[in-house]
Amino acid sequence: MCGILAIIGKGKEEALVQQLSKRMSHRGPDESDIHVTEKGHILAHERLSIVDLHTGKQPIQGTDSAWMVHNGEIYNHKKLRETTLKHHTFRTTSDSEVIVHLYEEFGYDFCDMLDGIFALVVIDGDDYIVARDPLGVKPLYYGMDERGRLYFASEMKAITDQCKSFSTFPPGHYYTEKTGFVKYYKPEWEAHEKAVEKLDLKALNASLTQAVEKRLMCDVPFGVLLSGGLDSSLIASITSRLLEGSGQELHSFSIGLDASAPDLVAAKKVADFIGTTHHEIHFTVEQGIEILDKLIWHLETYDVTSIRASTPMYFLSKAITEKGIKMVLSGEGADEIFGGYLYFRNAPSVLDFQKETIERVQKLFTADLLRADKSTMAHGLEARVPFLD
């Protein structure tokens, strides 16, 4: 995970762009770099190294004139290298590099080939494409200044004082000057009338296990968030099972006001049962109040629910990174997919239940995913969400 900034248009001072990018340095504490293209467009990148620690520095150049920046993870990058892109020469072993080569091979029509989470910008001369992953796991914003230059950034704080207007980049879309916004992600589940498959627990188990397994792709220490609820407990249990025989220690993390908090008690039971090395983090109400200004700066919202839910995650993320861990698996999305919230029981009909779950998943990027990303990335911690595979 990282922070990206791209400016389409000439005349912006490189030193200023570096300062703007540094506003997101918490997202990428490992490396920082900038590239000015021959046409005067600018790409900047703040890197949190998870895959290819030594040669994965960005911006990354393609075979010729195309350059790119990417925030996220491409889980099928090895398969793409060995099949679709087998005739291409790669400069790195980074998962991100496949993006620029897919652009070289297919032009704009490559986003649906990516299995992963991403906010990306590719610039080739005066041509460019900007895209965001299907559900908006990774944040992306765009704006325009008074001279008509376009800005794209992982966080609003990098561009707000440069743009006369800015907005959220829609998930599941790409944007080019020639096409405008194009919706590339068109899943069947968005049409409620197609929900005709019967429950298949074996298929569900296999699908979730596969989703967890692909998210273990990393070259750094990782762990699992564990609240003791069904969603995080499933993720932790599957991860533990996948690591059996590897000799790798799995760390689990939970947080609460004190050891008697219900979530901590439940999480401890799960951790003991599946055999993780468990860590309990405690914080006080006073500590929560003290960090409110800083938390709001990171979240970029005054929404009360988001701030309340992000407070423990902010403290937990800090404690996790202090133990040298850079990536965690989390249970976001399960309640929306399966109707886990209490109010779902009041659905007037099966159809209304189905429509509500669809809408909740579609809107995850406005709340839960935003909170999960920004409260963890405030401390350079990457959260991966298998339920949203």
Please provide the spans of the model-predicted regions.
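Conserved glycine-rich, hydrophobic/aromatic-active-site segments
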Residues: 110, 212, 295-327, 333-388
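Short aromatic-hydrophobic micro-motifs that form the base-stacking/packing surface
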Residues: 68, 329-330
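Short beta-strand "acidic-cap" motif of Rossmann-like dinucleotide-binding folds
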Residues: 252, 328-329
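Cysteine-centered catalytic environments shared across enzyme families
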Residues: 1-301
